[in-house]
Protein backbone atom coordinates (compact mmCIF):
# COMPACT_ATOMS: atom_id res chain seq x y z
CA UNK A 1 0.00 0.00 0.00
CA UNK A 2 2.76 2.30 0.83
CA UNK A 3 4.57 1.83 -2.47
CA UNK A 4 1.37 2.21 -4.42
CA UNK A 5 0.51 5.30 -2.50
CA UNK A 6 3.88 6.75 -3.24
CA UNK A 7 3.55 6.09 -6.94
CA UNK A 8 0.11 7.65 -6.98
CA UNK A 9 1.32 10.67 -5.17
CA UNK A 10 4.03 11.23 -7.76
CA UNK A 11 1.59 10.94 -10.61
CA UNK A 12 -0.85 13.33 -9.01
CA UNK A 13 1.98 15.79 -8.44
CA UNK A 14 2.89 15.69 -12.11
CA UNK A 15 -0.72 16.04 -13.10
CA UNK A 16 -1.04 19.19 -11.04
CA UNK A 17 1.97 20.70 -12.76
CA UNK A 18 0.62 19.84 -16.22
CA UNK A 19 -2.63 21.76 -15.74
CA UNK A 20 -0.92 24.87 -14.32
CA UNK A 21 0.58 27.23 -16.91
CA UNK A 22 3.60 28.26 -14.88
CA UNK A 23 6.94 28.99 -16.51
CA UNK A 24 9.62 27.16 -14.63
CA UNK A 25 12.49 29.24 -13.40
CA UNK A 26 16.12 28.30 -13.72
CA UNK A 27 16.82 27.18 -10.17
CA UNK A 28 13.94 24.75 -9.65
CA UNK A 29 13.89 21.73 -7.29
CA UNK A 30 12.81 18.39 -8.73
CA UNK A 31 11.71 15.45 -6.55
CA UNK A 32 14.51 13.09 -5.62
CA UNK A 33 13.50 9.40 -5.53
CA UNK A 34 14.93 6.94 -3.05
CA UNK A 35 14.69 3.41 -4.39
CA UNK A 36 15.95 1.86 -1.17
CA UNK A 37 13.34 3.28 1.15
CA UNK A 38 10.55 3.51 -1.47
CA UNK A 39 9.51 6.99 -0.42
CA UNK A 40 9.26 10.23 -2.31
CA UNK A 41 10.08 13.79 -1.46
CA UNK A 42 7.49 16.48 -1.87
CA UNK A 43 7.69 18.57 -5.04
CA UNK A 44 8.03 22.22 -4.19
CA UNK A 45 7.06 24.52 -7.05
CA UNK A 46 6.44 28.24 -6.61
CA UNK A 47 3.05 29.25 -7.92
CA UNK A 48 1.78 32.67 -8.97
CA UNK A 49 -0.74 32.74 -6.11
CA UNK A 50 2.13 32.13 -3.67
CA UNK A 51 0.63 28.85 -2.36
CA UNK A 52 2.30 25.55 -2.14
CA UNK A 53 0.72 22.58 -3.93
CA UNK A 54 1.30 19.45 -1.96
CA UNK A 55 -0.26 16.13 -3.02
CA UNK A 56 -2.15 14.22 -0.33
CA UNK A 57 -1.54 10.56 0.38
CA UNK A 58 -4.57 8.27 0.77
CA UNK A 59 -5.23 7.37 4.36
CA UNK A 60 -4.46 10.94 5.55
CA UNK A 61 -0.70 10.46 5.47
CA UNK A 62 1.67 13.11 4.09
CA UNK A 63 5.23 12.94 2.98
CA UNK A 64 7.05 14.18 5.98
CA UNK A 65 10.49 14.26 4.32
CA UNK A 66 11.97 17.71 3.78
CA UNK A 67 8.79 19.46 4.91
CA UNK A 68 10.85 22.26 6.40
CA UNK A 69 12.68 23.04 3.09
CA UNK A 70 11.98 26.44 1.52
CA UNK A 71 13.15 27.45 -1.95
CA UNK A 72 15.16 30.74 -2.01
CA UNK A 73 13.41 31.82 -5.23
CA UNK A 74 10.10 31.42 -3.49
CA UNK A 75 11.18 34.07 -1.03
CA UNK A 76 12.34 36.26 -3.95
CA UNK A 77 8.89 36.06 -5.53
CA UNK A 78 7.28 37.11 -2.25
CA UNK A 79 9.52 40.17 -2.12
CA UNK A 80 9.07 41.02 -5.84
CA UNK A 81 6.04 43.37 -5.46
CA UNK A 82 7.99 45.52 -2.99
CA UNK A 83 11.05 45.90 -5.27
CA UNK A 84 11.71 49.22 -6.96
CA UNK A 85 13.60 49.86 -10.17
CA UNK A 86 16.18 52.55 -9.57
CA UNK A 87 17.17 55.03 -12.32
CA UNK A 88 20.11 54.28 -14.54
CA UNK A 89 23.52 54.99 -13.17
CA UNK A 90 25.42 57.92 -14.67
CA UNK A 91 27.93 57.22 -17.39
CA UNK A 92 31.37 56.66 -16.02
CA UNK A 93 34.26 58.82 -17.08
CA UNK A 94 35.95 55.81 -18.62
CA UNK A 95 33.22 55.59 -21.28
CA UNK A 96 34.19 58.87 -22.98
CA UNK A 97 36.14 58.74 -26.22
CA UNK A 98 39.27 60.37 -24.83
CA UNK A 99 39.54 57.83 -21.97
CA UNK A 100 38.57 54.66 -23.83
CA UNK A 101 42.13 53.34 -23.71
CA UNK A 102 41.97 53.34 -19.89
CA UNK A 103 38.67 51.41 -19.80
CA UNK A 104 40.42 48.08 -19.56
CA UNK A 105 42.22 48.93 -16.34
CA UNK A 106 39.19 50.65 -14.77
CA UNK A 107 36.44 48.13 -15.60
CA UNK A 108 38.31 44.86 -15.53
CA UNK A 109 37.96 44.36 -11.72
CA UNK A 110 34.19 44.97 -11.98
CA UNK A 111 33.46 42.57 -14.82
CA UNK A 112 35.73 39.73 -13.79
CA UNK A 113 34.63 37.19 -11.13
CA UNK A 114 36.14 37.78 -7.72
CA UNK A 115 38.13 34.54 -7.70
CA UNK A 116 39.83 35.20 -11.02
CA UNK A 117 43.51 36.05 -10.76
CA UNK A 118 44.94 38.01 -13.68
CA UNK A 119 48.64 38.21 -14.13
CA UNK A 120 49.06 39.89 -17.51
CA UNK A 121 47.03 42.12 -19.75
CA UNK A 122 46.47 39.37 -22.28
CA UNK A 123 44.88 37.05 -19.70
CA UNK A 124 42.60 39.89 -18.62
CA UNK A 125 41.27 40.28 -22.16
CA UNK A 126 40.64 36.53 -22.56
CA UNK A 127 38.76 36.23 -19.26
CA UNK A 128 36.74 39.29 -20.14
CA UNK A 129 35.71 37.84 -23.52
CA UNK A 130 34.59 34.54 -22.01
CA UNK A 131 32.68 36.28 -19.25
CA UNK A 132 30.81 38.49 -21.70
CA UNK A 133 29.69 35.47 -23.73
CA UNK A 134 28.29 33.66 -20.68
CA UNK A 135 26.37 36.56 -19.18
CA UNK A 136 22.77 37.00 -20.35
CA UNK A 137 21.49 40.15 -22.00
CA UNK A 138 21.37 42.97 -19.43
CA UNK A 139 18.33 45.12 -18.97
CA UNK A 140 19.86 48.44 -18.01
CA UNK A 141 21.07 50.88 -20.60
CA UNK A 142 24.42 51.55 -19.00
CA UNK A 143 25.22 47.82 -18.73
CA UNK A 144 24.29 47.36 -22.38
CA UNK A 145 26.52 50.24 -23.41
CA UNK A 146 29.39 48.88 -21.32
CA UNK A 147 29.09 45.48 -22.96
CA UNK A 148 28.98 46.96 -26.45
CA UNK A 149 31.89 49.27 -25.90
CA UNK A 150 33.94 46.60 -24.19
CA UNK A 151 33.34 44.19 -27.05
CA UNK A 152 34.26 46.82 -29.58
CA UNK A 153 37.37 47.70 -27.66
CA UNK A 154 38.52 44.07 -27.61
CA UNK A 155 38.15 43.89 -31.37
CA UNK A 156 40.16 47.04 -31.82
CA UNK A 157 42.88 45.73 -29.51
CA UNK A 158 43.35 42.68 -31.72
CA UNK A 159 44.88 44.93 -34.40
CA UNK A 160 48.55 45.76 -33.78
CA UNK A 161 49.13 49.16 -32.21
CA UNK A 162 51.25 51.69 -34.13
CA UNK A 163 54.81 52.19 -32.94
CA UNK A 164 55.43 55.06 -30.51
CA UNK A 165 56.10 58.46 -31.97
CA UNK A 166 59.72 59.58 -32.17
CA UNK A 167 60.98 62.63 -30.35
CA UNK A 168 59.59 65.92 -31.63
CA UNK A 169 62.16 67.53 -33.89
CA UNK A 170 61.81 70.11 -36.60
CA UNK A 171 62.04 68.64 -40.12
CA UNK A 172 64.67 69.89 -42.46
CA UNK A 173 62.26 71.88 -44.59
CA UNK A 174 61.15 73.93 -41.57
CA UNK A 175 64.61 74.50 -40.15
CA UNK A 176 65.98 78.02 -40.72
CA UNK A 177 68.34 78.30 -43.63
CA UNK A 178 71.87 79.57 -43.05
CA UNK A 179 72.37 83.22 -43.97
CA UNK A 180 73.47 83.72 -47.53
CA UNK A 181 76.82 85.42 -48.18
CA UNK A 182 76.57 89.15 -48.90
CA UNK A 183 77.90 88.84 -52.44
CA UNK A 184 75.29 86.32 -53.58
CA UNK A 185 72.45 88.14 -51.87
CA UNK A 186 73.42 91.40 -53.52
CA UNK A 187 73.75 89.70 -56.90
CA UNK A 188 70.38 87.93 -56.93
CA UNK A 189 68.35 90.34 -54.81
CA UNK A 190 69.47 93.74 -55.98
CA UNK A 191 67.61 96.69 -54.43
CA UNK A 192 65.43 98.92 -56.52
CA UNK A 193 67.40 101.65 -58.32
CA UNK A 194 67.06 105.07 -56.79
CA UNK A 195 67.46 108.45 -58.37
CA UNK A 196 71.24 108.75 -57.74
CA UNK A 197 71.79 105.36 -59.41
CA UNK A 198 69.83 106.53 -62.44
CA UNK A 199 72.12 109.51 -62.66
CA UNK A 200 75.25 107.36 -62.66
CA UNK A 201 74.00 105.25 -65.59
CA UNK A 202 74.05 107.95 -68.29
CA UNK A 203 77.45 109.24 -67.08
CA UNK A 204 79.03 105.85 -67.63
CA UNK A 205 77.43 105.40 -71.01
CA UNK A 206 78.33 108.91 -72.09
CA UNK A 207 81.99 108.34 -71.15
CA UNK A 208 82.07 105.20 -73.29
CA UNK A 209 80.51 107.04 -76.19
CA UNK A 210 83.05 109.82 -75.81
CA UNK A 211 85.93 107.35 -75.98
CA UNK A 212 84.46 105.64 -79.05
CA UNK A 213 83.89 108.91 -80.88
CA UNK A 214 87.31 110.26 -80.01
CA UNK A 215 89.03 107.03 -81.03
CA UNK A 216 87.22 106.95 -84.37
CA UNK A 217 88.04 110.58 -85.12
CA UNK A 218 91.71 110.13 -84.26
CA UNK A 219 92.07 107.24 -86.66
CA UNK A 220 90.35 109.10 -89.49
CA UNK A 221 91.55 112.70 -89.10
CA UNK A 222 94.43 112.37 -86.56
CA UNK A 223 93.31 115.74 -85.24
CA UNK A 224 90.34 116.27 -82.96
CA UNK A 225 88.84 119.32 -81.39
CA UNK A 226 87.83 119.57 -77.72
CA UNK A 227 84.27 120.37 -78.72
CA UNK A 228 83.84 117.21 -80.81
CA UNK A 229 82.53 115.19 -77.88
CA UNK A 230 79.63 117.52 -77.19
CA UNK A 231 77.45 116.54 -80.23
CA UNK A 232 77.76 112.87 -79.35
CA UNK A 233 76.60 113.56 -75.84
CA UNK A 234 73.72 115.56 -77.25
CA UNK A 235 72.60 112.57 -79.29
CA UNK A 236 72.70 110.36 -76.24
CA UNK A 237 70.61 112.78 -74.25
CA UNK A 238 67.93 112.75 -76.93
CA UNK A 239 67.48 109.01 -76.56
CA UNK A 240 67.33 109.13 -72.76
CA UNK A 241 64.57 110.80 -70.69
CA UNK A 242 65.06 114.55 -70.22
CA UNK A 243 65.43 114.32 -66.45
CA UNK A 244 68.27 111.84 -66.81
CA UNK A 245 69.84 113.87 -69.61
CA UNK A 246 69.96 117.04 -67.57
CA UNK A 247 71.30 115.22 -64.53
CA UNK A 248 74.19 113.74 -66.53
CA UNK A 249 75.73 117.17 -66.98
CA UNK A 250 74.95 118.66 -63.59
CA UNK A 251 77.29 116.85 -61.16
CA UNK A 252 80.18 118.41 -61.73
CA UNK A 253 80.43 121.86 -62.46
CA UNK A 254 83.81 120.38 -63.59
CA UNK A 255 84.61 119.63 -67.21
CA UNK A 256 83.68 116.21 -68.59
CA UNK A 257 86.69 114.06 -69.36
CA UNK A 258 87.05 111.12 -71.71
CA UNK A 259 89.95 108.77 -72.20
CA UNK A 260 91.11 107.70 -75.65
CA UNK A 261 93.11 104.57 -76.55
CA UNK A 262 96.47 106.35 -76.17
CA UNK A 263 95.64 107.53 -72.66
CA UNK A 264 95.44 111.24 -73.53
CA UNK A 265 92.69 113.29 -71.94
CA UNK A 266 90.18 115.27 -73.99
CA UNK A 267 88.36 118.03 -72.12
CA UNK A 268 84.92 119.32 -72.99
CA UNK A 269 83.75 122.62 -71.44
CA UNK A 270 80.86 122.02 -69.07
CA UNK A 271 79.05 125.21 -70.09
CA UNK A 272 78.68 124.18 -73.73
CA UNK A 273 77.48 120.69 -72.82
CA UNK A 274 74.99 122.10 -70.35
CA UNK A 275 73.68 124.45 -73.00
CA UNK A 276 73.19 121.54 -75.40
CA UNK A 277 71.41 119.57 -72.70
CA UNK A 278 69.11 122.49 -71.90
CA UNK A 279 67.91 122.62 -75.52
CA UNK A 280 67.55 118.84 -75.83
CA UNK A 281 64.06 118.50 -74.23
CA UNK A 282 62.50 120.63 -76.97
CA UNK A 283 64.03 118.33 -79.59
CA UNK A 284 62.67 115.17 -77.96
CA UNK A 285 59.65 113.37 -79.48
CA UNK A 286 56.27 113.44 -77.77
CA UNK A 287 56.73 109.94 -76.31
CA UNK A 288 59.68 110.94 -74.14
CA UNK A 289 58.07 114.14 -72.92
CA UNK A 290 55.39 112.13 -71.11
CA UNK A 291 57.92 110.86 -68.59
CA UNK A 292 59.03 114.39 -67.70
CA UNK A 293 57.27 115.81 -64.66
CA UNK A 294 56.21 119.46 -64.92
CA UNK A 295 58.06 121.96 -62.83
CA UNK A 296 55.91 122.60 -59.73
CA UNK A 297 57.09 126.22 -59.54
CA UNK A 298 56.21 126.99 -63.17
CA UNK A 299 52.68 127.03 -64.64
CA UNK A 300 51.97 124.79 -67.58
CA UNK A 301 52.01 126.88 -70.77
CA UNK A 302 51.07 124.11 -73.20
CA UNK A 303 47.42 124.08 -72.17
CA UNK A 304 47.21 127.84 -72.57
CA UNK A 305 48.75 127.89 -76.05
CA UNK A 306 46.02 125.62 -77.40
CA UNK A 307 43.26 128.19 -76.82
CA UNK A 308 42.32 130.96 -79.22
CA UNK A 309 41.95 133.57 -76.48
CA UNK A 310 45.67 133.40 -75.58
CA UNK A 311 47.90 135.75 -77.58
CA UNK A 312 51.21 135.41 -75.76
CA UNK A 313 53.57 138.28 -74.95
CA UNK A 314 52.19 141.62 -76.08
CA UNK A 315 52.20 145.07 -74.57
CA UNK A 316 49.27 146.38 -72.58
CA UNK A 317 48.72 149.34 -74.89
CA UNK A 318 48.53 147.19 -78.03
CA UNK A 319 45.91 144.85 -76.57
CA UNK A 320 43.78 147.72 -75.22
CA UNK A 321 43.76 149.45 -78.61
CA UNK A 322 42.58 146.30 -80.40
CA UNK A 323 39.77 145.74 -77.87
CA UNK A 324 38.65 149.36 -78.13
CA UNK A 325 38.39 148.96 -81.90
CA UNK A 326 36.26 145.83 -81.44
CA UNK A 327 33.97 147.70 -78.99
CA UNK A 328 31.90 144.73 -77.76
CA UNK A 329 31.11 144.09 -74.14
CA UNK A 330 32.42 140.78 -72.82
CA UNK A 331 35.24 140.49 -75.37
CA UNK A 332 38.38 139.25 -73.64
CA UNK A 333 41.96 138.09 -74.19
CA UNK A 334 44.71 136.53 -72.08
CA UNK A 335 48.29 137.78 -72.43
CA UNK A 336 51.57 137.29 -70.62
CA UNK A 337 52.24 139.59 -67.72
CA UNK A 338 54.87 142.28 -68.34
CA UNK A 339 56.57 141.52 -65.01
CA UNK A 340 57.29 137.92 -66.16
CA UNK A 341 57.12 136.54 -62.64
CA UNK A 342 56.02 133.08 -61.54
CA UNK A 343 53.55 134.50 -59.04
CA UNK A 344 51.68 136.51 -61.74
CA UNK A 345 52.22 134.78 -65.10
CA UNK A 346 49.09 135.97 -67.03
CA UNK A 347 46.68 138.91 -67.32
CA UNK A 348 43.00 138.72 -68.29
CA UNK A 349 41.97 141.70 -70.45
CA UNK A 350 38.20 142.40 -70.63
CA UNK A 351 36.29 145.10 -72.52
CA UNK A 352 33.08 146.41 -70.89
CA UNK A 353 31.35 149.81 -70.93
CA UNK A 354 33.87 151.56 -73.19
CA UNK A 355 36.65 150.58 -70.81
CA UNK A 356 39.33 147.94 -70.80
CA UNK A 357 40.03 146.13 -67.52
CA UNK A 358 43.27 144.24 -66.82
CA UNK A 359 42.84 141.54 -64.15
CA UNK A 360 45.91 139.63 -62.99
CA UNK A 361 45.95 135.83 -62.83
CA UNK A 362 48.05 134.60 -59.91
CA UNK A 363 49.76 131.23 -59.55
CA UNK A 364 49.95 129.77 -56.03
CA UNK A 365 52.97 127.52 -55.61
CA UNK A 366 51.75 126.11 -52.28
CA UNK A 367 48.78 124.25 -53.76
CA UNK A 368 49.63 124.49 -57.50
CA UNK A 369 46.47 126.41 -58.41
CA UNK A 370 45.45 129.67 -60.06
CA UNK A 371 43.46 132.58 -58.66
CA UNK A 372 42.01 135.69 -60.25
CA UNK A 373 42.58 139.22 -58.93
CA UNK A 374 44.53 140.49 -55.97
CA UNK A 375 42.81 138.24 -53.44
CA UNK A 376 41.58 141.08 -51.21
CA UNK A 377 37.89 140.40 -51.90
CA UNK A 378 38.00 136.64 -52.24
CA UNK A 379 40.45 134.01 -53.18
CA UNK A 380 38.63 131.49 -55.35
CA UNK A 381 41.14 129.01 -56.75
CA UNK A 382 41.13 126.98 -59.98
CA UNK A 383 43.25 124.17 -61.32
CA UNK A 384 44.05 125.88 -64.65
CA UNK A 385 43.51 129.08 -66.61
CA UNK A 386 40.94 127.30 -68.77
CA UNK A 387 38.83 126.64 -65.68
CA UNK A 388 38.87 130.36 -64.89
CA UNK A 389 37.63 131.31 -68.36
CA UNK A 390 34.94 128.61 -68.34
CA UNK A 391 33.75 129.60 -64.86
CA UNK A 392 33.24 133.27 -65.71
CA UNK A 393 31.35 132.51 -68.89
CA UNK A 394 28.50 131.33 -66.61
CA UNK A 395 29.09 133.55 -63.57
CA UNK A 396 29.71 137.32 -63.67
CA UNK A 397 33.16 138.69 -63.00
CA UNK A 398 33.54 141.74 -60.72
CA UNK A 399 35.36 144.59 -62.51
CA UNK A 400 36.97 147.39 -60.46
CA UNK A 401 38.66 150.47 -61.93
CA UNK A 402 41.99 150.95 -60.18
CA UNK A 403 42.22 154.65 -61.09
CA UNK A 404 38.72 155.52 -59.90
CA UNK A 405 38.04 153.44 -56.78
CA UNK A 406 34.95 155.48 -55.88
CA UNK A 407 33.26 154.47 -59.13
CA UNK A 408 30.51 151.93 -59.24
CA UNK A 409 31.59 148.31 -59.51
CA UNK A 410 30.52 146.47 -62.60
CA UNK A 411 29.84 142.84 -63.32
CA UNK A 412 30.37 141.24 -66.69
CA UNK A 413 30.22 137.83 -68.36
CA UNK A 414 32.99 136.62 -70.65
CA UNK A 415 31.09 136.26 -73.92
CA UNK A 416 33.65 135.74 -76.69
CA UNK A 417 37.37 136.02 -77.33
CA UNK A 418 38.64 138.57 -79.83
CA UNK A 419 38.35 137.03 -83.35
CA UNK A 420 41.59 136.87 -85.29
CA UNK A 421 43.35 138.38 -82.31
CA UNK A 422 46.80 137.26 -83.30
CA UNK A 423 46.47 138.53 -86.86
CA UNK A 424 45.30 141.95 -85.70
CA UNK A 425 48.03 142.23 -83.12
CA UNK A 426 50.69 141.27 -85.63
CA UNK A 427 49.38 143.94 -88.00
CA UNK A 428 49.32 146.47 -85.18
CA UNK A 429 52.88 145.62 -84.18
CA UNK A 430 54.10 145.89 -87.78
CA UNK A 431 52.47 149.30 -88.17
CA UNK A 432 54.01 150.48 -84.94
CA UNK A 433 57.43 149.43 -86.14
CA UNK A 434 57.05 151.27 -89.46
CA UNK A 435 55.93 154.42 -87.71
UniProtKB/Swiss-Prot annotation:
Residues 226-249 have a biased composition (Polar residues). Disruption phenotype: No visible phenotype. Keywords: Cytoplasm, Phosphoprotein, SH2 domain. GO terms for molecular function: protein-containing complex binding. The record marks 335 as: Interaction with FYB1. Expressed in T-cells, mast cells, natural killer and natural killer T cells (at protein level). Expressed in cytokine-stimulated hemopoietic cells. Signal peptide: none annotated. Residues 178-182 are annotated as: Mediates interaction with LAT, GRB2, and FGR. An adapter protein which plays a role in the regulation of immunoreceptor signaling, including PLC-gamma-mediated B-cell antigen receptor (BCR) signaling and FC-epsilon R1-mediated mast cell degranulation. Together with FGR, it acts as a negative regulator of natural killer cell-activating receptors and inhibits interferon-gamma production. Acts as a positive regulator of both T-cell receptor and natural killer T (NKT) cell receptor signaling in CD4-positive NKT cells. Together with MAP4K1, it enhances CD3-triggered activation of T-cells and subsequent IL2 production. The N-terminal proline-rich region interacts with the SH3 domain of PLCG1. The SH2 domain is important for restoration of BCR-induced calcium response and JNK2 activation in BLNK-deficient DT40 cells expressing LAT. This is Cytokine-dependent hematopoietic cell linker. It comes from Mus musculus (Mouse).
Amino acid sequence: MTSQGNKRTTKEGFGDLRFQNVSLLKNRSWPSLSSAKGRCRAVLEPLPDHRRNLAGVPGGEKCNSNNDYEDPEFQLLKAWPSMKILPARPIQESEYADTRYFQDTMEAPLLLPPKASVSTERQTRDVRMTHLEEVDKPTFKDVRSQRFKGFKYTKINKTPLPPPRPAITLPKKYQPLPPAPPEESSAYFAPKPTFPEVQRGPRQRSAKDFSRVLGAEEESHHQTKPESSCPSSNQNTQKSPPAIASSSYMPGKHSIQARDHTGSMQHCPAQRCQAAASHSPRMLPYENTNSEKPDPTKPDEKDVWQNEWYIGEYSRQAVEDVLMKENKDGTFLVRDCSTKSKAEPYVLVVFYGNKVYNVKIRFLESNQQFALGTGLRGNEMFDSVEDIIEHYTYFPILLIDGKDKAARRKQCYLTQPLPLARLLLTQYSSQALHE
